Amino acid sequence: ITGMVFPVLMFPACIIYALAELLIPELARCNAAGSSHRVIYLVRRSLKVTLLYSLIFSGGMFLLSEPLCTALYNEAQIAKHLRQYSCLIPMLYCDAITDAMIKGLGQQKMSVRYNILTNILDVAFLYLLLPRYGIGGYFFSFLVTHIINFGLSYRRLLKITKLQIPWHIPIFSLACGAFAIWVSSHTQRYPVQVILYLVILFSGLTAL
């Protein structure tokens, strides 16, 4: 999984990490200048763009997992793992940008604490679950620790920026993506699946 699934899963995130590198000094500058409105604008905009970007690739990898794994590794059995982890892309990408933003706002120590906590939990979960449940235990550990890390970072970001984001926006966006995947997966041709997914996704998100 680490050598075959994660490279495909995280390859599109290179754009997110590039954005994160640009955000850190810009947020630090705005924070030092007391430009709270600019900080809130950047945070809100970055989260929206990252969520949309991640939903596009999450659905695309879910639907194209089999041809992708066959083309890259000549191994279709890896596709089931790529489908499983592709559902976590929105959280993983949003976590990356959130972590960068709290660092830019002077919360490096908190970021380190969160990472240390989740790493300790990860080791504990793997020690307890991996021998008994195998790949399933690894997925559970990965899911729980990343949810905790993202939850703590996101909560910290909202606290220091005093930004209020209605919960219905991310929930509706994720539900729209899940519905688009469900509808698209009922077609057999891969290009049609992706086009249908994007049409349904963007149609739903324009309602926000």
What label would you give each PLM region?
Residues 63-64, 71-72, 128-133, 155-160, ...:
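Helix-loop junctions at the membrane-solvent interface of multi-pass transporters
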Residues 2-94, 98-107, 113:
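Specific pore-lining/lateral-gate transmembrane helices of multi-pass inner-membrane transport
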Residues 16, 35, 130, 189-194:
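Intrinsic-disorder/low-complexity, polar/charged segments
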Residues 17-20, 80-106, 110-130, 135-157, ...:
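Short runs within selected transmembrane alpha-helices of multi-pass transporters and secretion channels
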Residues 7, 43, 47, 51, ...:
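Hydrophobic, aromatic-rich alpha-helical transmembrane segments
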Residues 34-37, 159-174:
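Interhelical loop/hinge segments that connect adjacent transmembrane helices in multipass membrane
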Residues 18, 59, 135, 190-191:
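Residue-level detector of secondary-structure boundary/capping sites
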Residues 167-208:
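Transmembrane alpha-helical segments of multi-pass transport proteins
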